[in-house]
């Protein structure tokens, strides 16, 4: 619920101040809702990242047609997500312009790209997996 200035540079241990735009409980509730998107039955199960809980949103839009209105066969597909959902370290948006083939929905087209890229980014950043926390059960682990 806090907006912080974006940067590509790591500033050591310097604390970056932001401004609160959502109260903490509302932000937590929205993140919890967005985790359902990548769980079984959600619209972006292919965006899931092994051993991490992901929160995200899919998007699919028709592109504007040259002759006016919207094209029936040209789309933009996207998936925007963050991980780990309970304490986000990384946020990412994957957009695919005019996906080819029969699938054009964000969860099916951009979701797998998000999954692979986020998985590598979390590994490179040494973000501890959720699976190592004893009180967290991931959808991929099933019920014990």
Describe these PLM feature segments.
Residues 22, 72, 102-113:
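Short alpha-helix boundary/capping segments
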Residues 30, 57-59, 80, 92, ...:
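Residue-level preference for non-acidic, small/hydrophobic
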Residues 79-80, 88-104:
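Short, well-ordered beta-strand elements
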């Amino acid at each position: 619920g806090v907006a912080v200035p974006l940067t590509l540079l790591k500033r050591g241990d310097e604390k970056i101040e932001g401004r609160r735009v959502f109260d903490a409980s509302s932000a937590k509730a929205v993140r919890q809702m967005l985790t359902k998107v990548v769980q079984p039955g959600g619209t972006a199960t292919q965006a899931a990242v092994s051993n991490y809980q992901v929160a995200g949103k899919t998007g699919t839009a028709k592109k504007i047609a040259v002759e006016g209105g919207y094209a029936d066969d040209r789309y933009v597909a996207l998936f925007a997500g963050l991980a780990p959902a309970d304490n986000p370290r990384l946020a990412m948006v994957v957009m695919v312009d005019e996906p080819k083939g029969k699938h054009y929905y964000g969860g099916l087209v951009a979701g797998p790209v998000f999954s692979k890229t986020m998985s590598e980014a979390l590994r490179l950043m040494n973000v501890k997996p959720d699976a190592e926390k004893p009180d967290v059960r991931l959808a991929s682990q099933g019920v014990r």
